[in-house]
Amino acid sequence: GLDDAILIKDNHVAVCGGVDAAVRRARAMAGHLMKVELEVDGLDQLDDALALIGEGLAPDVIMLDNFSLDDLREGVRRTAGRITLEASGGVDLTTVRAIAETGVNVISVGALTHSAPVLDIGLDAV
């Protein structure tokens, strides 16, 4: 369901005043069993999230949104397996292998929902 985790998006980060404040707020609201995922759009935000590891407040998953392949590799290097990394944005059949080879743990494919072909179904009541 949509109630078993917290996803911190870019607008949440902006409203809270930055990654640190947004993650701290989410952690304060989340129970110890609730996962927290953070979307970041640059290596600077990734570094802000990684800085919370020492306090035990870092997100469980960090979504690297629309990162280049080089930045994905660098994110994997900086994270060094301490947090699950998800790649998102620009994923399709032509890019998925190269994205997987960067070393991220998870790849999300938005095209499965926003670009899926429409099936025309009709129903006749009898």
Question: Where are the language model's segments positioned?
Answer:
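Gly/Ser/Thr-rich beta-alpha loop segments that engage phosphate groups in nucleotides
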Residues: 3, 13, 91-92, 112, ...
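Catalytic cores of alpha/beta
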Residues: 42-57, 67-80, 85-87, 91-109
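Flexible C-terminal active-site loop/helix
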Residues: 98-126
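Flexible, active-site-adjacent loop/turn segments at secondary-structure boundaries
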Residues: 4-6, 65, 89, 110, ...
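Glycine- and Gly-Pro-enriched alpha-helical subdomains that act as flexible
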Residues: 1-71
